[in-house]
């Protein structure tokens, strides 16, 4: 069995295609996992979808046929041609897939290295797949190690100190444009995590924030959480507010643009629209007074961020590498379990037969049979303890073959485990 990861990110796929690939809607995510799971070669799968990436992580029997099936499933659901997906996708297998997963969880593969949102998004994607029975023990164990790795990266590096997200980069861009934005007012559309982060960064810069959301109760709740610099307005005020204020940040989960040319009025002051949603919320024409920044337009600030964090990222990648090795060593030790079980079953079988013979021949009283069984089993348990420990330390093919030959047992094993440590 093999781990595979198919990745579409800001590195290999433009925002227009990423919009089509988005699985952030639960119904859509459920459907892609259903299509993927229809292939008998794919035992487990999960789908991660954020503004900067779409990832499918799977545990499969045959890598090549599974990868083709996954790409074909995405093509069927999104109508993006198979060839276009195949051309763009970064594909990782086995050790590469686990290393990539750990790097993603540790925010080393993010548009903004060190941003803290990705861990929560990954946990949510895993929980969704687990609750819907699309993944089991093999992806669960990988995710457990991934979150452990991410925690170690946060603890041993400064890469996530002063947390940075796409939302904070958008606010940083506004500061770059205006200098001091304290005292200004900004409209934030949406009440989800990205909107909340944008609003919080604006308030930290002493900007008055107006929250607009289709669900007015959510807008009201968020405004209350943010404090006295935050207020809210009903969604039917959207057109009025985006034509009144200079700073507009939008991060809704809408499937189509909510700000279009039809609701834009001509004004004689500069307005800056920050579209931090995927799919995009804003589809308007720019002119001398209207400026639009989408997720991909923020890469210049992100590159600066990368340069500042390069040394810490190097340390973090070292942790990811060690965690990847530790994961496969753990998998290998778990792979020794069938051998240990086979030895103990063999010992138990022999003990039971010999005790029965002893009873039949009169060497052992029938009333003492249970106590004798317990004693013999304890002896075998003690005898097999050291071999069991040694097997977990080095579960090599030669040792397993020798055990099969010497004790006449059959050991079921995963041929792929040891190869990942070479």
UniProtKB/Swiss-Prot annotation:
Residues the entry annotates as binding substrate: 50-53, 110, 115-117, 121
Positions of the catalytic residues: 51
Catalytic activities: (S)-4-amino-5-oxopentanoate + tRNA(Glu) + NADP(+) = L-glutamyl-tRNA(Glu) + NADPH + H(+)
Signal peptide: none
Residues binding NADP(+), per UniProt: 190-195
A UniProt-annotated Pfam family: GlutR_N
Top-rank taxon: Bacteria
One of the GO BP terms on file: protoporphyrinogen IX biosynthetic process from glutamate
Alphabetical list of InterPro entries matching this protein: 4pyrrol_synth_GluRdtase, 4pyrrol_synth_GluRdtase_dimer, 4pyrrol_synth_GluRdtase_N, GluRdtase_CS, GluRdtase_dimer_dom_sf, GluRdtase_N_sf, NAD(P)-bd_dom_sf, Shikm_DH/Glu-tRNA_Rdtase
Its EC number(s): 1.2.1.70
Site (Important for activity): 100
Single annotated GO MF: NADP binding
Pathway(s) it belongs to: Porphyrin-containing compound metabolism; protoporphyrin-IX biosynthesis; 5-aminolevulinate from L-glutamyl-tRNA(Glu): step 1/2
Keywords: NADP, Oxidoreductase, Porphyrin biosynthesis
Recorded family membership: Belongs to the glutamyl-tRNA reductase family.
Function: Catalyzes the NADPH-dependent reduction of glutamyl-tRNA(Glu) to glutamate 1-semialdehyde (GSA).
Record note on quaternary structure: Homodimer.
NCBIfam families with a match to the protein in the record: hemA
Domain comment in the entry: Possesses an unusual extended V-shaped dimeric structure with each monomer consisting of three distinct domains arranged along a curved 'spinal' alpha-helix. The N-terminal catalytic domain specifically recognizes the glutamate moiety of the substrate. The second domain is the NADPH-binding domain, and the third C-terminal domain is responsible for dimerization.
Matches recorded under PANTHER family: GLUTAMYL-TRNA REDUCTASE
General remark: During catalysis, the active site Cys acts as a nucleophile attacking the alpha-carbonyl group of tRNA-bound glutamate with the formation of a thioester intermediate between enzyme and glutamate, and the concomitant release of tRNA(Glu). The thioester intermediate is finally reduced by direct hydride transfer from NADPH, to form the product GSA.
Protein name: Glutamyl-tRNA reductase
Organism: Campylobacter fetus subsp. fetus (strain 82-40)
Taxon lineage: Bacteria, Pseudomonadati, Campylobacterota, Epsilonproteobacteria, Campylobacterales
